[in-house]
């Protein structure tokens, strides 16, 4: 369920750079799983470090608040069939849908944990992705697997097909985020954030927090095994480079060459920063959610151009609409900003 207004006000009052009308959004009545519509407020600011950012983000660009009142949002994905964006609310084990002009509405629950035994922690879906057939793939924390939704878009039910749930006979920790390449191979990260007791959880089976490749024919390979907390993952426009954010120590955004066979080589530090979810535009700029309460924008050469300062913890971002809109999951909110460059895949 969504937080009550009384529980939100103290947190909102501590947030700087938030337009006053956001209090209206936070106090919206919750009826039938819908967040009542309100005039869109704005939040945060744009920090410009390099003049090249002006070609990406216009001087009058603003981050709009599309939805509020969630527990912790993650995994935005644009779905053409719905003409909207889906995103996870992990602690509430739910996926929400936002479409232009309407309120955000509960779209699927449960989304990441389908067990009968009640559990706490981050049990829901995290990263969401469309495969090449247009199906919805989910990194499910609670069920500890990568799954495909086996349901219609217009009347979704919590029916899932398991794509993979273990490596060499041992259950995954809690798959977090995922990316797919042109031939349909799926790459995903597996940190322990979805385990109720983290690395000390007695149900933990794998010693490694790995990155994996699931090929279109169903074979599974561990392609990275030396990152403490692999998190966000995304391909460069030519798919010759795979970026992976490490949210453990030392915090770093890694880059890997992708061989013709799909293996990884030449792992190197791309940018020294903590990071969560990643997105890439068609010019190869890398958008890193998480550090310093916002989204860093980094050139293909690893130079910081600026940031989208949301003023709060930020988990992920993804391009949508016509490709020029960046959707951002930030704490209890879903945000968007219009850019001058398109995201990869548009």
Please give the residue ranges for each predicted region.
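N-terminal secretory signal peptides that target proteins for export/translocation
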Residues: 1-15
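Sequence-structural signature of mature extracellular/luminal beta-sheet repeat domains
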Residues: 37-346
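Bacterial Sec-dependent signal peptides at the C-terminal "C-region" and cleavage site
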Residues: 29-39
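Residue-level detector of intrinsically disordered/flexible regions characterized by low predicted structural confidence
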Residues: 5, 17-18, 248, 287
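Detector for intrinsically disordered, low-structure N-terminal pre-sequences
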Residues: 8, 24, 34-35, 76
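Bacterial N-terminal signal peptides
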Residues: 17-31
